[in-house]
Each structure stands twice: as structure tokens, then as C-alpha cells.
From Swiss-Prot:
The chain crosses the membrane at residues 42-62, 73-93, 111-131, 154-174, 207-227, 251-271, 295-315. The keyword Protease does not apply. Its main location: membrane. It comes from Chlorocebus pygerythrus (Vervet monkey). It is a multi-pass membrane protein. Residues 63-72, 132-153, 228-250, 316-352 are cytoplasmic. This is B1 bradykinin receptor. Keywords: Cell membrane, Disulfide bond, G-protein coupled receptor, Glycoprotein, Lipoprotein, Membrane, Palmitate, Receptor, Transducer, Transmembrane, Transmembrane helix. The gene is BDKRB1. It holds the Pfam family 7tm_1. Disulfide bonds join 109-188. InterPro entries: Brdyknn_1_rcpt, Brdyknn_rcpt, CCR1-9-like, GPCR_Rhodpsn, GPCR_Rhodpsn_7TM. The lineage of its organism: Eukaryota, Metazoa, Chordata, Craniata, Vertebrata. Residues 1-41, 94-110, 175-206, 272-294 are extracellular. This is a receptor for bradykinin. Could be a factor in chronic pain and inflammation.
Length: 352
């Protein structure tokens, strides 16, 4: 194929990745020239926003001198995962700018791609865990104990990070740099040792990392929404009902944003698998999949910088935590206005 997506670059051997007639399907040179010029700038912008935004989220969650609740434990881990992910984006921006000529050596080829692959699993598993926690809290509230949920959340997050790391081991082992004399580049590619690995990879990528988690997310959130509709009047009078509803609204927004950002990537990854096993063939499909994967990767990248924006504009309780942190870090002499006046200003400024 004409190019390779940053999240998963693969080849069984060089002849498959760069066939003799590879240029026969080069039907969109203008599109590729535009992509090589424009996409790196957007990726660096995403990296900058994601770095600052996720650092801000982690500071808001971790600086206050109190224990995190269950939702905050999951959201802090999601922010940490996004932060690690965006740290690898400048390398891929430079890679695309160089027309996929990897300049950073074999170690970073494996390390950066391994981290990106681990983040793919960690993020989706955290979204499942967050949805499952909301499901237990709202659909089965009598069986949900706060202390037990907090301990379970910590253990779950540790397991998710470990599993994500284990699932990225093939990427660490099979990634390598390879010279491509016809294109005069040295590419960072995933060297699959056997044709069967293509099938194993798509099972891992599309089923384990998307379809199964998607089924769980849809199940949990369907019952969450049904529970919220059925208990709307009760939740208004129940202690903490408004707080639970606000937190659930934030989490549902995060879930929708995650699926919108990542679904196109998995769709094009599946099309790429069909192309590799020759289920679909033609220059149209090759160019469509190549360009589509690049744009789908970009959309997936945006999710890591979008989450902090969602926290600020959807998460009212998060904004309250920001205000509390500001009061904690600001000397009283610098904030002489009355608390009621300050609260009024705060509510007017952040009103949705």
C-alpha cells in the first residue's frame, strides 16, 4: 500500500509492503502532498493541547488534600493514559513530515509504537470500567458500597495498565526499521512473521480492542439511561442524586466522544485487513484505505486532547473542583470579596 497508518504499520515482508507495481495505484499525489504538509501541524497542535489539558486535569484531581472518589480515580487514570499517549505524537508528526522516513532509530520505533498500542487498549478498557461503575452505582445501588468500590477501582486500574502493557508486547517485539530502496526511506514497520498474524492482529485490534468493549459499553450505558429515566423524580430528592446525574452526564459524553473518535480507525483497519487478504482489490480501495487511515488516525489522536475540554464544559463538578483548588492555592489576602459574591461570579461565568 502507498503509505502506513501511525497506529499500526505492518508487513509480512518487504515484497508485500512494497510490490513492484506499488506506484500503479498512486492516484492521489496531491492529497498525499497536502497530508505530508498539513497533518504534522495538526498533530503537534493536538499534542500541545493534550499535554496542557491532561496535565491540568491531573493537577485538579491530585493536588487537593483529599481522597479521590471512584469516578475521579478512573478519570485520573484516563487523563494519565492520554498524557502518555500525546507525548509520542511529535515523533509521528516528524515521521509524516519526512514522508514516513523514520529518523529516530529502532529503539524509539518500538517504544513509541508500543506505548501508542498500549494506550489504545488502556483507554477503551478504562471507558468500559467507568461505564461498569456507573452501571453498578445507578442500576444496582444497594449492592454498591463506597469503600469497596474505591478499592475495586484502584485494583481495576492497575490491572488495566498491566493488561494494556502485555497486549502491546507483540508491537514492542515485531516493530523494526527497514530500508526501502525504491522510496529512498527507512520505514518503521510492523514485521509480521506469518500470514496468520494478519488474522490474529485484526482479531486483537477490532474485536478485543473495540467490538467486545463496545458491546459492554452499549449494554452498561443503555441500562444507565433507562435507570435515569425511570428514577428521575426519585433522584431529585435522594441525597446525592444531582451529583450522580452530573457525573453520569460527564461520563456519557466522554463515552460518546471516545466512540466517535475511534470508530473510524477500527473501520479502516478492518478494510485494510480485507485488502491484505485480497478480499477487496483495486486502486480505488488502496487509495481510499490509505488516505482514510491517515485521517482516521488523526481523529483518534484528537480524543486525547478532547477529554480535558469535555471536563471543563460538561463537568460542572469538575469546574467546582477547579474553583476549590484555586481557593486552596490562593492566599486569602488576594481574594477579599465575599464568598457569596465570589460564588455568584463563578456561577455566571461557567453557566451552561
Amino acid at each position: 500500500m502507498a503509505s502506513w497508518p501511525p497506529l499500526e504499520l505492518q508487513s509480512s515482508n518487504q515484497s508485500q509492503l512494497f510490490p513492484q507495481n506499488a506506484t500503479a495505484c498512486d492516484n492521489a499525489p496531491e492529497a498525499w502532498d497536502l497530508l505530508h504538509r498539513v497533518l504534522p501541524t495538526f498533530i503537534i497542535s493536538i499534542c500541545s493541547f493534550g499535554l496542557l489539558g491532561n496535565l491540568f486535569v491531573l493537577l485538579v484531581f491530585l493536588l487537593p488534600r483529599r481522597r479521590l472518589n471512584v469516578a475521579e480515580i478512573y478519570l485520573a487514570n484516563l487523563a494519565a493514559s492520554d498524557l502518555v499517549f500525546v507525548l509520542g505524537l511529535p515523533f509521528w508528526a516528524e515521521n509524516i513530515w519526512n514522508q514516513f522516513n523514520w529518523p529516530f532509530g529502532a529503539l524509539l520505533c518500538r517504544g513509541i509504537n508500543g506505548v501508542i498500542k498500549a494506550n489504545l487498549f488502556i483507554s477503551i478498557f478504562l471507558v468500559v470500567a467507568i461505564s461498569q461503575d456507573r452501571y453498578c452505582l445507578l442500576v444496582h445501588p444497594m449492592a454498591s458500597r463506597r469503600r469497596q468500590r474505591r478499592r475495586q477501582a484502584r485494583v481495576t486500574c492497575v490491572l488495566i495498565w498491566v493488561v494494556g502493557g502485555l497486549l502491546s508486547i507483540p508491537t514492542f517485539l515485531l516493530r523494526s526499521i527497514q530500508a526501502v530502496p525504491d522510496l529512498n526511506i527507512t520505514a518503521c514497520i510492523l514485521l509480521l512473521p506469518h500470514e496468520a498474524w494478519h488474522f490474529a492482529r485484526i482479531v486483537e485490534l477490532n474485536i478485543l480492542a473495540f467490538l467486545l468493549p463496545l458491546a459492554a459499553i452499549v449494554f452498561f450505558n443503555y441500562h444507565i439511561l433507562a435507570s435515569l429515566r425511570g428514577r428521575e423524580e426519585v433522584s431529585r430528592t435522594r441525597c446525592g442524586g444531582r451529583k450522580d446525574s452530573k457525573t453520569t452526564a460527564l461520563i456519557l459524553t466522554l463515552v460518546v466522544a471516545f466512540l466517535v473518535c475511534w470508530a473510524p480507525y477500527h473501520f479502516f483497519a478492518f478494510l485494510e485487513f480485507l485488502f491484505q487478504v485480497q478480499a477487496i482489490r483495486s486502486c480505488f480501495w488502496e487509495d481510499f484505505i490509505d488516505l482514510g487511515l491517515q485521517l482516521a488516525n488523526f481523529l483518534a489522536f484528537t480524543n486525547s486532547s478532547l477529554n480535558p475540554v469535555i471536563y471543563v464544559f460538561v463537568g460542572r463538578l469538575f469546574r467546582t473542583k477547579v474553583w476549590e483548588l484555586y481557593k486552596q492555592c490562593t492566599p486569602k489576602s488576594l481574594a477579599p470579596i465575599s464568598s457569596s459574591h465570589r460564588k455568584e461570579i463563578f456561577q455566571l461565568f461557567w453557566r451552561n
